[in-house]
Amino acid sequence: TQGVSSAASDVYKRQLKKYCESLNLIFLSSACDIEAIDELDELEIAALKVPSCELSDLGLIRHMAQTGRPLILSTGLADWMDIQRAIDTCRDVGNRNLVLLQCTSLYPAPPHLSNLEAIKVMRDAFGVLTGYSDHTEGNHVCLASVALGACVIEKHLTLDRKLVGPDHPFSMEPTQFKEMMLRLRDVEAALGDGTKTGPRSEEREVFEQGRRSLHAKIRIPKGAVIKREMITAKRPGLGIPPYLLDLIIGRVARSDIE
């Protein structure tokens, strides 16, 4: 959220964490110094966030990784070696619970600089989960990131975009945020599992009424040799499918076919 001081007291953090849990939300926070890491670790935070500007601070990342908690590393401004060094630092102390976020460190960021393909490339290159830290306006780039496999999305939230501060103008207000979440869930559901096993149960009626099956164009008497011009394909698709036509042509009718 916006407008909260980075010097928020330990008491405030505990209250905020408790409130999040009452809403079935996960309390997360970035940590930019050793003291903050230790405070958040004591709070038993679910994961620690490494901001983009701290990705080259390997001492800070090492201290985070040594907590054993999952780390979310934002990769704005980074090149491949920056990312590799950060990952190696975590793995060297036994922490492999990592998520890399593709990020463009502009506020706001124009969509054409979002480089969402990096979500897939980083996942394949480093063998870790990947997501997207979004600074664009609107929700369309976030939706696209899900289709590319983002499993974590960071989006700025504010109570009022007119508040003073660098992040408020491109952040989402609660109503917009809720709408984005509903659409994200739709996109997740729409991705499916990639299998193609024929019509789903919900499609059965369309399948039967829309597909065609083979029918006799004329009466075919018993004993007649079936020829191409005797057969047509018509709806509904409850009989012999058209792809079997070549197997039928040239056969002898074993009974009268109307």
Ranges and model annotations:
Residues 26-33, 46-57, 70-78, 101-102, ...:
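Catalytic beta/alpha-barrel core
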Residues 189-258:
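Conserved SET/PR domain catalytic loop and adjacent active-site segment
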Residues 80-194:
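Catalytic alpha/beta core domains of metabolic enzymes, predominantly
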Residues 40, 74, 100, 149, ...:
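Conserved, mostly hydrophobic/aromatic
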Residues 1-8, 12:
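Single conserved hydrophobic/aromatic residue that forms the stacking wall/gate
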Residues 34-46, 55-67, 85-99:
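Alpha/beta enzyme core
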Residues 18-24, 41-47, 65-72, 122-129:
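Short, surface-exposed connector motifs at secondary-structure boundaries
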Residues 14, 18, 38, 62, ...:
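Alpha-helical segments flanking ligand/cofactor-binding loops in enzyme cores
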